[in-house]
A protein has these predicted regions:
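Venus flytrap/periplasmic-binding-protein-like
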Residues: 78, 124-125, 130-134, 211, ...
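Bacterial N-terminal signal peptides that target proteins for export
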Residues: 1-11
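Beta-alpha junction/loop-to-helix N-cap segments that form part of ligand/metal-binding clefts
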Residues: 28-30, 43-53, 57, 61-136, ...
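Extracellular/periplasmic Venus flytrap/periplasmic-binding protein
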Residues: 84-87, 132, 140-250, 287-294
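Periplasmic-binding protein-like
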Residues: 92-106, 124-126, 174-179, 205, ...
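Hydrophobic helical h-region of N-terminal Sec-dependent signal peptides
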Residues: 9-21
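Segments of small-molecule ligand-sensing domains
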Residues: 307-319, 330-403, 437-438
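Extracellular/periplasmic periplasmic-binding protein-like sensory domains
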Residues: 139, 246-326, 405-409, 413, ...
């Protein structure tokens, strides 16, 4: 009898243990992080993922999670390499309660499109990614939030037009695009050619092989070309090397326009005085003046839980972009919980939250992020969210905003995006959605 009693006790204990495990999993929303903290792009990786993790820590510590659901995460080092990124995906994809993937890598994002679609888990590519994934009718689970490569290009050309006296004054001008030799760098080749034809300027596109620590021949070519402006589509070490090499060849820094991955403190400080006057596009502001950043300092860093090793990087461009990425992920979860309940959500439910993600100035202020970014208005068929951009100029010690928020030319861009996305749908035999319920 004692044996049977003990067996029953053990069975009850095992059942309780399983129930406890299920409850623990039910109270967890998991983020698998394909981060990169070593290699030539470590500055971007440590800053962005540091900010992302800092915001998740803030929400857990200050708010007890989202609707009582704790936010958890695990990092996998990719070194910004596609193969490693896919390996991390395969290793972590079975973890319960995955909210979304956030690789911050165009190459990894491309490799995951079919995988996340099959697994029904969102993939967020803030400020980057495949341009036509903006069309949510075709790419149900991919979200190039705030800015895609084509809208970035439109913003840059609009800014240059303003500097030369208007769009009609672009005719006859020469623009060189110096781009990183990767899928990310090559993404905008077609749109620059299209805009050159539209406005009548000449464009010359020059590749810099990865990682970009030698550019002498490219800048000699630029010197011979004598362009009016150079657009720098760099990443990591390529950016300060470009600015220093430009100075050596006599090209003025204030006629170099950096893209969204050439706009951080880590891009200009190593270049020294060669960066003074340099201009770059941005979708997120730098600085620690924002209440959400101050909350992170007080709640996370003062408690010894901050993710950045160097506290001087708090509030820098990459760090603030990571914080903003955290805000967008968490808000999508909050919105989805309002519909599906305060519990662990499925990836598909988080996708619904993302397709209803709307943050105006009032909501941004409530989140402590007023002025950190402009706004976002995602819908089931527009996965970018009508992001706006601004331009900033480096004065040798800090970035100064030199423009208002600028909206891309959506009337021009949307038909181009849809043509590409519908061709992809035909190739992959994807049924084009007609509503959020599809």
């Amino acid at each position: 009898m004692s044996f049977i009693k003990n067996l029953r006790t053990a069975a009850i204990a095992a059942t309780l243990a399983i129930s406890s495990l299920q409850a623990a999993q039910a109270d967890e929303q998991f983020f698998p992080l394909q981060s990169y903290r070593v290699g030539p792009y470590a500055a971007g990786g440590t800053g962005f993922f540091g900010g992302f993790i800092d915001y998740l820590n803030l929400v857990n510590t200050r708010d007890g999670g989202v609707g009582g659901v704790k936010l958890t995460w695990e990092e996998g080092e990719t070194q910004y390499e596609v193969e490693r990124g896919v390996e991390v995906y395969e290793r972590l994809k079975t973890h319960p309660g995955i909210a979304a993937w956030n690789p911050l890598s165009v190459g990894i994002a491309y490799a995951l499109i079919d995988r996340v679609t099959a697994d029904k888990v969102p993939l967020l590519t803030i400020n980057h990614g495949r341009t036509d994934t903006t069309d949510g009718r075709v790419f149900k689970y991919i979200f190039p939030l705030l800015l895609n490569p084509y809208s970035e290009t439109s913003g840059i050309v609009n800014y240059i037009a303003g500097k030369v006296g208007g769009e009609d004054k672009l005719k006859g001008k020469k623009i060189v695009v110096l781009y990183h030799g990767s899928p990310y760098g090559k993404e905008t080749i077609p749109i620059y050619e299209l805009l050159a034809k539209k406005y009548g300027f000449t464009v010359q596109q020059i590749e810099v092989p990865h990682p970009g620590n030698e550019q002498q021949s490219q800048w000699l070519t630029i010197r011979r070309a004598k362009p009016d402006y150079v657009v720098l589509r760099g990443w990591g070490v390529m950016n300060p090397v470009a600015l220093k090499t430009a100075q050596k060849t006599g090209f003025p820094a204030d006629h170099i326009i950096g893209n969204v991955w050439s706009n951080s403190e880590e891009d200009v400080i190593p270049a020294g005085d060669a960066a003074k006057g340099y201009v770059a596009i941005t979708s997120v502001a730098a600085g620690t003046q924002f209440p959400v950043v101050q909350d992170i300092v007080k709640t996370v860093y003062d408690a010894g839980k901050g993710n950045l090793e160097d506290k001087k990087r708090i509030g820098t461009r990459y760090h603030n972009l990571g914080i903003l990425n955290g805000i967008l992920n968490v808000e999508a979860i909050r919105i989805a919980q309002a519909k599906f309940g305060k519990r662990t959500l499925t990836g598909d439910e988080v996708r619904w939250g993302l397709e209803n993600l709307k943050i105006d100035e009032a909501r941004a202020a409530a989140l402590g992020a007023k002025g950190l970014f402009h706004s976002i208005n995602v819908s089931w068929d527009n996965h970018e969210g009508d992001g706006s951009v601004a331009f900033q100029q480096w004065d040798g010690s800090k970035w100064n905003v030199v423009s208002d928020w600028i909206a891309p030319d959506w009337k021009l861009l949307r038909p181009i995006i849809e043509k590409s996305s519908l061709a992809y749908a035909k190739e992959k035999n994807i049924k084009v959605r007609t509503s959020i319920n599809d």
